[in-house]
C-alpha cells in the first residue's frame, strides 16, 4: 500500500514538473496549431533537373533540389476544385500577378491567391489562376494555359510527403545585445555610442608683429628682442620653439 502511494506521488510530481517546463519554454514553432501530417512539398522536374517549390521570408519564390523548411507547404481546399497554398515556415500565401509571376504574400487575396487544381493523365497536378489564366510554374516562360496543350516546363507538380525533421522548424528568436546611437540619451548617459570628434591639425600662424620702439617699454631699449628672447629661452628652455607648433583642433 505504501509503495503504491509513493508511485502515485512520484507520477503526480513528474506531471507537474513537465507542465511547468512546457509553460516556461513555450512552443515557438510556426507549425503550432497546424496539422503536422498535412505538410507537403510540390515537386516538379524535367528530363535534366528537378525542384521543390519554396517560399522565402521576403516573398521570393524559387525552386530547390531538396526539401527545405521553406518548401514545406500547406494546401487547403477552399471551393470545389480550388486550393490555397501557404508556406508553413513563412506563413505567406502563394499568389500570382497579372503577368503570371508567382510570389509569397502575407495578405490573402481571393483573386490572386486561389488556384484551381487539376490532375493530369500522367498523375501530375497543375494549378491554374482563374483570374490570370496562367499556371503556377517555376520556369521563366509564361503563357496563358489552354486545355489540350502541353503545359510549360516546371508547371506539373507532385505532392510529396514532408521529410524535413520537425526540429528544423523551430527557430530561436535572436536577442539584441547591442545598442544604437539613435537610442534615447537615458540609455547612453556617458555618450559611449555617439561618434567621437576627429582631431585634424589646423595650421596656426606663428608670426607676430614686432612692437614699435615709439610705444616705450622694453621694446624701446631692445628693438630686436634679443634680451626678451634670452629670457624666454632661459625660462622655457627647449620648449620655447614648441609654442609655435600648431595644435590639433577638434572639428
Swiss-Prot record:
The keyword Ligase does not apply. Its main location: secreted. Keywords: Differentiation, Disulfide bond, Glycoprotein, Growth factor, Phosphoprotein, Secreted, Signal. Following secretion this protein is inactivated by cleavage into a N-terminal fragment and a C-terminal fragment. The processing is effected by proprotein convertases. Residues 179-189 have a biased composition (Basic and acidic residues). Coiled coil: none annotated. Residues 1-24 form the signal peptide. One of its GO terms (cellular component) is extracellular space. Glycans are attached at residues 171, 178. GO terms for molecular function: fibroblast growth factor receptor binding; growth factor activity; type 1 fibroblast growth factor receptor binding. The modification Phosphoserine is found at residue 180. It comes from the Eukaryota. Disulfide bonds join 95-113. Gene3D superfamilies: 2.80.10.50. Residues 175-251 are annotated as: Disordered. GO terms for biological process: calcium ion homeostasis; cell differentiation; ERK1 and ERK2 cascade; fibroblast growth factor receptor signaling pathway; intracellular phosphate ion homeostasis; MAPK cascade; negative regulation of bone mineralization; negative regulation of hormone secretion. Mainly expressed in the brain and thymus at low levels. In brain; preferentially expressed in the ventrolateral thalamic nucleus. The keyword Signal applies. Regulator of phosphate homeostasis. Inhibits renal tubular phosphate transport by reducing SLC34A1 levels. Acts directly on the parathyroid to decrease PTH secretion. Regulator of vitamin-D metabolism. Negatively regulates osteoblasts differentiation and matrix mineralization. Up-regulates EGR1 expression in the presence of KL. Belongs to the heparin-binding growth factors family. Interacts with FGFR1. Interacts with FGFR2, FGFR3 and FGFR4. Affinity between fibroblast growth factors (FGFs) and their receptors is increased by KL and heparan sulfate glycosaminoglycans that function as coreceptors. This is Fibroblast growth factor 23.
Amino acid at each position: 500500500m505504501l509503495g503504491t502511494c509513493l508511485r502515485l506521488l512520484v507520477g503526480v510530481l513528474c506531471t507537474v514538473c513537465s507542465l511547468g517546463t512546457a509553460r516556461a519554454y513555450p512552443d515557438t514553432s510556426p507549425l503550432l496549431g497546424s496539422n503536422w501530417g498535412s505538410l507537403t512539398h510540390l515537386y516538379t522536374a524535367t528530363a535534366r533537373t528537378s525542384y521543390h517549390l519554396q517560399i522565402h521570408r521576403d516573398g521570393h519564390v524559387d525552386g530547390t533540389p531538396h526539401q527545405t523548411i521553406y518548401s514545406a507547404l500547406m494546401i487547403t481546399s477552399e471551393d470545389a476544385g480550388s486550393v490555397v497554398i501557404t508556406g508553413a515556415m513563412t506563413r505567406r500565401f502563394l499568389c500570382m500577378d497579372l503577368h503570371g509571376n508567382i510570389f509569397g504574400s502575407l495578405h490573402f487575396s481571393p483573386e490572386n491567391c486561389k488556384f484551381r487544381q487539376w490532375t493530369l493523365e500522367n498523375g501530375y497536378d497543375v494549378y491554374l489562376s482563374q483570374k490570370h489564366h496562367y499556371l503556377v510554374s517555376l520556369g521563366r516562360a509564361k503563357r496563358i494555359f489552354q486545355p489540350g496543350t502541353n503545359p510549360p516546363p516546371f508547371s506539373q507538380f507532385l505532392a510529396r510527403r514532408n521529410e524535413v525533421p520537425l526540429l528544423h522548424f523551430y527557430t530561436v528568436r535572436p536577442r539584441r545585445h547591442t545598442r544604437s546611437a539613435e537610442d534615447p540619451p537615458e540609455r547612453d548617459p556617458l555618450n559611449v555610442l555617439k561618434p567621437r570628434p576627429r582631431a585634424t591639425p589646423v595650421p596656426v600662424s606663428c608670426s607676430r608683429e614686432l612692437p614699435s620702439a615709439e610705444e616705450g617699454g622694453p621694446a624701446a631699449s631692445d628693438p630686436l628682442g634679443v634680451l626678451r628672447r634670452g629670457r624666454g629661452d632661459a625660462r622655457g628652455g627647449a620648449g620655447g620653439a614648441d609654442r609655435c607648433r600648431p595644435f590639433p583642433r577638434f572639428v
